[in-house]
Amino acid sequence: MPKNNSDLMIKKIIFAAATLLLLSCGDNSRVIEENVLPTPMHIEKASGKFTFDGGIKIEINAPVEDSIRLLQALTDVGITANNNAGKSITLLLCDSVAGITSPEGYRINTTTKHITAEGTNGAGLFYAVQTIAQLYNAVNCIPCGTITDQPRFEYRGLMLDVSRHFFGKEYVKKQIDAIARYKMNRLHLHLTDAAGWRVEIKQYPRLTQFAAWRSQELWKDWWYGDRQYREEGAPDAHGGYYTQEDIREIVQYAADRYITVIPEIEMPAHSEEVLTAYPQLSCTHEPYKQADFCVGNEEVYTFLENVLTEIMELFPSKYIHIGGDEAAKASWPTCPLCKSRMKEEGLANVNELQSYLIERMERFVNSKGRSIIGWDEILEGGLAPNATVMSWRGTDGGIKAVHAGHKAIMTPGEFCYLDSYQDAPHAQPVAFGGYLPIEKVYSYNPVPDSLTPDEAALIYGIQGNVWAEYIPTEQLNEHMIYPRILAIAEIGWSPQEKRNYEQFRTRALNAVKQLRRNGYNAFDLSREYGNRPPSLAPNNHLAKGKKVAYATGSPYYPTYTAGGDSALTDGIHGGWNNSDKRWQGFIGRGGIDVCIDLEEEKRIKSIAADFMQLCEPGIYLPAEVEISASADSSTFHTLATIGHNVVRDDTLSLKSYGWEGETKARYIRYRAIRGKQGGFMFTDEIVVK
């Protein structure tokens, strides 16, 4: 017990000072590893530290444009120049830098009085500044020694979907600031989709006078409602768009931070908004009828070329994204113009007809000195000669692309779709579905093991995508982006052999604190709930390891086997994600009808199975479950019939259908029947106790 209040106060001051020392470079050993994200390629440590006190002399030896950008980057984090100071930061543009092969690489040498950063390109020096800034913000010093660093991949991107819900210019610039801090260099803007056209095209004013505005503010209300568009200025019009001046401002703002903005203009699908504003570009020539352009109509190519001409004037990026995904092609087989086009061009099917459009648009874009990116569906029907593939439906698209000698950007939904839940659904805002915690994002390696070194070199990079169907606000958008985009950043930058999740998590926790201090609505990683508790340990029960027989007409779906015939009695429960290879999926009319052989008669007190509902991808709870038991597998007596009124909602929910009582049986029959809505049923384990 302290002698008096003065003693207590002195102890508090000593403790606070010791804590501050630990937070301010007092121990050099882990400062860089815990605060620089992405983790650097190589660190050589020396004794001592450079502290940011008493003013800093700043010297920059680079072209004027780079010098202005670099000085601004230092100023933005609070490092200001004092030409009379005894300490200095020197940024040098060099012809070559030891240990660096990438133009985005850098080398920082630190003594107690001087920091010298070298790079062969303005971008490299900019990333050196980001490393300096992270340490300055975190601990107000830099340990002495040398950091040699460069990116693993050339393309390190974030995609913002600004169609499903529109996010304004200042918000986009704010995200540019954040991703630049973590050495990301591409911002992909998904500018067009059914939910709204978001960029001014002067030759086609109806795209922003009409196609940019819809009848409901929330995408889900509009999509499951009337799906009507509105005139700009109408009382019930919701939406927005970027003027061409807005785009120029965003592009320049990004360029000043060494980020390239890549525009996406969807074709031939996801174009309801265009075809309602300009219905003559569809196969039916009627508004509100089509999502796909009429590929046989020559006017479509005139429209697309005119749009892309204005887009390329606004966006100087080498790459233009032209979509190419999820075309229904429903009207093409019967459309006279499409049929005529197929005959004239000798096209065998509608997949080749889509490839005709993609290849033709590629030739146009190439003629302007640019190249195209498309979602992996552009592989169907033949890949355009110079296209880069963005692989989202798993990794197969990327593998096929590099096998054919094309570049691939890896963004598989399983690891890179940041619109999925990042924590337990009950603790998070409603999301599109799935469960993608930061640890799983971080586990992804964009280079498949099956690739040769030459093929691996064609993996251009990685991208995190934030689809906004269920993200109506800027605050929620940030919550979904951060901190998971930090995992994407480190995957894209750091050597594979340097990556370690526990060490990354420490960096990410520190980064989240900084992001929140800077006004970003980042998810608080320190309060992560984690995966579904039953999934964390095996469940030992009477049916574990026992044989399961599936009735004719009740097979599990090939994509969701969860390991096959043993899945429902393997003792392993699923997590929050139906795609985690633990949930078995059923879609046939027979529903679920299985029989478990316990091998001998057992005294049984309970039988239960959990089911998942996630309506957006079409996963529903059973409308009815029947549980029965038998001693001989021929005569079954019903233990329970459980009905349920299936109601569509937005949230992920789990429900247990079970029986409790007392019986003896060797065989357990478990049947689950779908409701009128159809869709999938998913269950993970039939637990018998």
Segments from the language model and where they lie:
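Bacterial Sec-dependent N-terminal signal peptides
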Residues: M1-E34
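Aromatic, loop-rich ligand-recognition surfaces of beta-strand-rich domains
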Residues: W576-A640, T651-K689
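Flexible, acidic glycine-rich loops studded with aromatic residues
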Residues: S371-E377, G382-A387, R393-P538
